[in-house]
Amino acid sequence: MDKNDYLHFERNPSLFPKSTLDKVQKTKKYIEHYYKVAVDHAVERNQRRINLEQRLATERGSEERKNRQLRASGEKESQFLRFRRTRLSLEDFSTIKVIGKGAFGEVRLVQKLDTGKIYAMKSLLKTEMFKRDQLAHVKAERDLLVESDSPWVVSLYYAFQDSLYLYLIMEFLPGGDLMTMLINYDTFSEDVTRFYMAECVLAIADVHRMGYIHRDIKPDNILIDRDGHIKLSDFGLSTGFYKQDQSASYMKPRTGNTVKRGQMVDAIWLTMSSKDKMATWKKNRRVMAYSTVGTPDYIAPEIFLQQGYGQDCDWWSLGAIMFECLIGWPPFCSENSHETYRKIINWRETLTFPNDIHLSIEARDLMDRLMTDSEHRLGRGGAIEIMQHPFFTGIDWDHIRETAAPFIPNLKSITDTHYFPVDELEQVPEQPVTQQPASVDPQTLEQTNLAFLGYTYKKFNYLTMKGAL
């Protein structure tokens, strides 16, 4: 046969239909993910073996004992491999009570059916996360919780998904959150404030150590454990991590009646007594926590101004929370988010301290140095700058988690939820909605599922504990 009789085929992807190209990209992503996960797990497994061998090499003991530990480690790895192949689903958990609600998700107290263990289950609606371009934030939250070994960050045990939701199965902290405490107690003494702010400093410093910026530090996200100590949560909820389009909407100039309403609100707010301000803030606080916009009261001005920001933006938030603990309301609170934003941007004129509330020189100085320009903000050079401030004199930074907390939850059972606003969440369904809305087309659903590829996670150290599986 003459070589000219051969049919030469030149691959030209531009001639393929879009549906074919989409399938190719989808298949490519799935294959890449499969091998990446396999390699990552092999590397982690090998590193655990190396760490164990190095530890055993430094310990005294017989070779027989060391060999037993190595064999036990191998059995645990095999157990973990088997468990990794099982698929978790919503059916593996039963809801005890709804304990929290966000704009696009919920937090439930749940029990794992096969072990009886109690967890907090956070669910996020995938279509909303996808539509609102929250993919990076959702991934950042999951990745931080996976990487964290900090006692100051809520522990993540499992992450999984179905066609509707993303699920994070985390430790349940029965003491509620700092927002609930502030609503119940109005204000804290300086000693109590000192304790909580010191623990917040260490918690934020740990987040920064892992290479993250929280950007949404607020009382709602500071949880209280059974011993009264704090842990940070919510590293990517839609009500936090303000995006550029949200910031831009705040910056639109107000016209017509809107300006007059804002001016009237400010006039009324300025004539309120401290007691009235506190009551007004408490009345509106829960509503703002549940809204799609959230509350900007604790956000640093540089985040709104899109000037670029660093880890020190979290220290501004700490100053705003400290103000609320001592005064009874945040420093820039208003009747609406636009007014709050305006006040934060113009903080030099709007940051004032009420004359009828006594503050020590040290407390006032610390707040002034936290809520200031980023260039001069305390903590810009690291958490040590804040830890050395005179307000924290007497704090045992190395052992603060071992000291008695000023408030220890009085719990009647491991499922006690009376520190959560469960009465306000009665309208939330007992079980998450499991049917896909008719308005969601199959192509969007397929894109959404592909976007969250790799979200699943199971914690090795926890799963291999005795009785954890």
From Swiss-Prot:
Residues 93-392 form the Protein kinase domain. CDD domains: MobB_CBK1, STKc_NDR_like_fungal. It comes from Schizosaccharomyces pombe (strain 972 / ATCC 24843). GO terms for molecular function: ATP binding; protein serine kinase activity; protein serine/threonine kinase activity. Pfam families: Pkinase. Residues 393-467 form the AGC-kinase C-terminal domain. Coiled coil: none annotated. Interacts with pak1/shk1 and coordinates cell morphogenesis with the cell cycle. It is essential for maintenance of cell polarity and is involved in mitotic control. The keyword Cytoplasm does not apply. Transmembrane segments: none annotated. The keyword tRNA processing does not apply. Interacts with mob2. This is Serine/threonine-protein kinase orb6. InterPro entries: AGC-kinase_C, Kinase-like_dom_sf, Prot_kinase_dom, Protein_kinase_ATP_BS, Rho-assoc_Ser/Thr_Kinase, Ser/Thr_kinase_AS. It catalyses: L-seryl-[protein] + ATP = O-phospho-L-seryl-[protein] + ADP + H(+); L-threonyl-[protein] + ATP = O-phospho-L-threonyl-[protein] + ADP + H(+). Keywords: ATP-binding, Kinase, Nucleotide-binding, Phosphoprotein, Serine/threonine-protein kinase, Transferase. GO terms for biological process: cellular response to salt stress; cortical actin cytoskeleton organization; establishment or maintenance of actin cytoskeleton polarity; intracellular signal transduction; maintenance of protein location in cell cortex of cell tip; positive regulation of establishment or maintenance of bipolar cell polarity regulating cell shape; positive regulation of exocytosis; RAM/MOR signaling. Belongs to the protein kinase superfamily. Ser/Thr protein kinase family. ATP binds at residues 99-107, 122. The gene is orb6. Its EC number is 2.7.11.1. GO terms for cellular component: cell cortex of cell tip; cell division site; cytosol; growing cell tip; nucleus. The active site is at residue 216. Signal peptide: none annotated.
